[in-house]
């Protein structure tokens, strides 16, 4: 489904590429914000913008000058995505100053910084206005998205466009709040009903559909998630994120031919050059599923290698990092796994992150990889308490912990420390039997 004309009539078209220009816009970000950026990437592609996404072009460790050579230098505009979680001062300062210099020297180049949360900006960035997307944690939408597109083209918004943008901002914010409220209360039916409400923010970008699908996956409503995400894919055929989530839902459900279908989706993305940590991470997960069925160590090693590739490409990506660590432990490469786990804890710390289930249980798993059973059990409990209705997330976390304990051989008392936070899963399974 193309973006509705009601929205397109206000959206500026991409500028023509002049001599030497290859891209309409260059996106610069840290991998921790990759899902948000993928949604921006998808909508820009849908609007026929040529987009340079450095995560797809660059392997971690490359020098900035090298990656800018064919990216930023040959782009009409640059968007720098900033959040507190990605506030690596060296990276932010380098990328910001590079784009600022380019904008100063070339009036045709449009530099648009974007912030994803309400925290204060770094001091060096105080002189430039940032586009504020703090109300859109899962991807751009609403009037802010329209304003961003105007900013990268350098066009001015008409009064009608401004009024339209303000209305869309309110509609999108209302939908996001409704979706997250339904996730908190475990109300999958309301999530599906919201998707079928068919108001304009659902038709503009895939971000709301992805949020709905991901919430259903977290609630272990895999059938509903798959059906919804297939609809999002049909509406936004160029979008990457719905396909990733569709594959994840299939892998989590694990019925009949689900694993093969998930691998086909991800292998196609991989073959098309999509090597971002999310694609690699979910693909790696399906190889682990194959190992659980086959017992073939080659499948386990393939899983670990894809996770490790994702982590090398994005060293701040804790999801691929912790899985590279844990799969190394399962391969009897304990020292390697413990070293990666230690590095992750140096990056994110050893304290629970309020409201962030996955970061908190990542800390727990890194502690488990290092045989710190009491601390790991305590951290798992804090993660469960943050998201008590996310049974799908709990099952995935517990499954990994069980595999690790089989390899690490804790004492019965140590095993009980890890199992205690997950007792509700056993009770729930007994009730559903």
What kind of region is each of these model predictions?
Residues 69-70, 74, 80-119:
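Amphipathic helical hotspot of TIR/SEFIR-family domains
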Residues 1-46, 110, 115-193:
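C-terminal interaction surface of TIR/SEFIR-family domains
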Residues 253-258, 290-296, 329-340, 369-373, ...:
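Alpha-helical linker/edge segments of TPR/alpha-solenoid repeat scaffolds
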Residues 198-203, 229, 236-237, 266, ...:
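Alpha-helical junction/boundary sensor with strong preference for TPR arrays
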Residues 39-70, 84-92, 132-136:
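Conserved BB-loop
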Residues 167-182, 201-214, 236-253, 274-293, ...:
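Amphipathic alpha-helical repeat scaffolds of TPR domains
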Residues 311, 325, 342-343, 373-390:
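TPR/TPR-like (Sel1-like) alpha-helical repeat modules
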Residues 179-193, 214-228, 251-265, 295-304, ...:
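Helix-turn-helix repeat elements of alpha-solenoid scaffolds
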